[in-house]
């Protein structure tokens, strides 16, 4: 047994992802608390280490999706990709001297409070038990695949995997690929693999509200200012903070200054679409994107949700609709009835022969351990 497991810590932190690292930094600043981070993987990063599917990136601007106490002047673009976020988290772990407080390859099975000892007891798969006076859970929700309940899913004889467990060893070239799901994960990887497969069928249960993504690469002058001009990086980060808060207040708080300001600012768009509330601004942006990127009117109808924008996650992207328009890509909106050895059967009576199934069906967000 690890000798450290006999020690009683002030705080045990579960997970060395963004939440765990942020908690550790604040405990280090306090300097009066002994703590240990228990991380199941071999490195930090949490979801940004475990998820590696093509096209994975953050839909929050990079200078806002980072710690205020560890501003990064070297982000290469507005919306960073997975590897860049993981590099950032690895770097700050060392820069802030957090790594010595992390026990890697330590999968937590349970944490329970011992009322008799007035301590938390955290049990690992290895059999070790760590005790602490306080417990901080930094366990994320975006790492356990959610598999659809489709009859015959286990009978498929071809290759299959979930986007959360991307099989990089499998060559998709010249394969007939079925993608089940069209949420954020699928919308991320579909454009990246569409050109390499011989045929792709995207099975869509319901469309999502998709809006334009204002993404660009930072030029050398901008990065110079972010690194060397006093307070510029903090001001730029606050700029993104303000935009996010403005959108929240305007979207969820009706008839306030922010919502009225934005409605006036894009009155031309609102008039065109006969929409008069702030959340309709996003809908207008989505409809404009569809108009610009899709020519077939009947195809457009399949991509417009029948529910109000904001009921589900709004997805920013510029390359999903063009991917669906490729000659080797088709969108299937008939519901899946069952899966057989080499086919997907839809409820309209058709059969689709395929070589591989990629499940882009998201995560089981109700399971933490």
Describe each model-derived feature in a short phrase:
Residues 104-119, 329-347:
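A conserved short coil-to-beta-strand element within the FAD-binding core of flavoproteins
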Residues 7-9, 125-134, 172-173, 347-356:
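Core beta-strand elements of the Rossmann-like FAD/NAD(P) dinucleotide-binding domain
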Residues 77-143:
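Feature captures the FAD/FMN-dependent oxidoreductase FAD-binding
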Residues 72-91, 103, 274-282, 307-319:
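Short beta-strand to alpha-helix junction loop
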Residues 356, 360-369:
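Glycine/threonine-rich phosphate-binding loop and adjacent beta-strand/alpha-helix elements that clamp
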Residues 5-8, 13-18, 22-37, 41-43, ...:
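Rossmann-like dinucleotide-binding core of oxidoreductases
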Residues 9-13, 18-102, 204-205, 292-298:
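Beta1-alpha1 glycine-rich phosphate/pyrophosphate-binding loop at the start
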């Amino acid at each position: 047994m690890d000798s450290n497991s006999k020690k009683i810590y002030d705080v045990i932190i579960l997970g060395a992802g963004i939440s765990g690292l942020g908690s550790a930094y604040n405990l280090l600043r306090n300097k009066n608390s002994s703590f240990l981070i228990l991380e199941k993987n071999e490195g930090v990063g949490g979801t940004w280490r475990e998820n590696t599917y093509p096209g994975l990136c953050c839909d929050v601007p990079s200078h806002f999706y980072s710690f205020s106490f560890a501003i990064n002047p070297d982000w290469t673009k507005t919306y960073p990709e997975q590897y860049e976020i993981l590099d950032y988290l690895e770097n700050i772990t060392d820069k802030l001297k957090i790594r010595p407080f992390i026990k890697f390859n330590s999968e937590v099975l349970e944490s329970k409070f011992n009322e008799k000892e007035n301590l938390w007891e955290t049990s690992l798969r290895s059999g070790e038990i760590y005790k602490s006076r306080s417990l901080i859970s930094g366990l994320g929700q975006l790492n356990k695949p959610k598999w659809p309940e489709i009859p015959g899913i286990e009978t498929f004889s071809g290759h299959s995997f979930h986007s959360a467990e991307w099989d990089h060893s499998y060559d998709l070239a010249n394969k007939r690929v079925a993608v089940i799901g069209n949420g954020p994960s699928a919308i991320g990887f579909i454009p990246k693999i569409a050109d390499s497969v011989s045929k792709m069928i995207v099975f869509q249960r319901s469309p999502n509200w998709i809006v334009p993504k204002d993404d660009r690469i930072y030029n050398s002058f901008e990065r110079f200012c972010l690194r060397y001009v006093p307070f510029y990086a903090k001001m730029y980060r606050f700029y993104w903070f303000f935009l996010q808060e403005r959108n929240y207040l305007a979207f969820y708080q009706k008839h306030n200054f922010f919502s009225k300001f934005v409605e006036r600012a894009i009155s031309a768009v609102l008039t065109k679409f006969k929409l008069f509330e702030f959340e309709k601004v996003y809908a207008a942006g989505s409809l404009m994107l569809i108009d610009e990127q899709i020519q077939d009117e009947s195809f457009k109808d399949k991509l417009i949700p029948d529910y109000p924008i904001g009921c589900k996650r709004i997805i920013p992207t510029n390359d999903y609709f063009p991917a669906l328009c490729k000659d080797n890509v088709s969108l299937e909106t008939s519901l899946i009835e069952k899966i057989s050895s080499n086919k997907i059967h839809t409820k309209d009576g058709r059969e689709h022969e395929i070589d591989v199934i990629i499940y882009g069906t998201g995560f089981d967000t109700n399971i933490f351990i």
